[in-house]
Design a protein with these regions (language model features):
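Short beta-edge/loop segments at beta->alpha junctions of small alpha/beta modules
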Residues: 1-77
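Nucleic-acid-binding surface
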Residues: 61-144
Length: 144
């Protein structure tokens, strides 16, 4: 018989473990519950406890990850690049309202929590020139 997870326990445990963005398999690993129990719990608490980033990817509502962290997990493999990286490094003076990333997958655009994330296709040979950076306690891939 499986134990019943309580929302406050789940929230506190995820925060204590530093899990701000997770998939159902991540949730299973953290709490040791079945896939069905995971799916039911996440579905039941998606309005109050979790933010659905996309199918199979969720964030805590109370302790949301930074946009850069979401950008790296939303559509992998990818790294933050183009206009967003140029603005972040102070190379262009304009404010950038879209997180732009490079990916080897097809070009896509997502809107999560009223924030736009754009992924531009590049060839596999060109998928380099990035480094890891700590943002909000989490590792993010960012163009050099």
């Amino acid at each position: 018989m499986e134990r019943k997870l309580k929302p406050i326990y789940v929230q506190q445990h995820l925060q204590a473990k530093g899990v701000r963005l997770f998939s159902p398999s991540d949730f299973q690993r953290v709490f040791g519950v079945s896939l069905r129990a995971t799916q039911e719990f996440v579905k039941d608490h998606c309005d109050d406890l979790f933010l659905k980033v996309r199918n199979g990817l969720y964030a805590l509502r109370i302790d949301q990850p930074r946009d850069e962290v979401i950008a790296n997990r939303l559509y992998a493999p990818s790294y933050i690049s183009f206009e967003y990286a140029l603005s972040r490094y102070g190379i262009i003076p304009e404010s950038v309202y879209t997180i732009t990333s490079a990916t080897t997958r097809i070009t896509r655009e997502f809107v999560v929590n009223n924030k736009s994330f754009t992924y531009s296709h590049i060839k596999k040979q060109a998928y380099r020139g990035y480094r890891t950076e700590k943002i909000g306690g989490m590792t993010v891939l960012m163009a050099e």
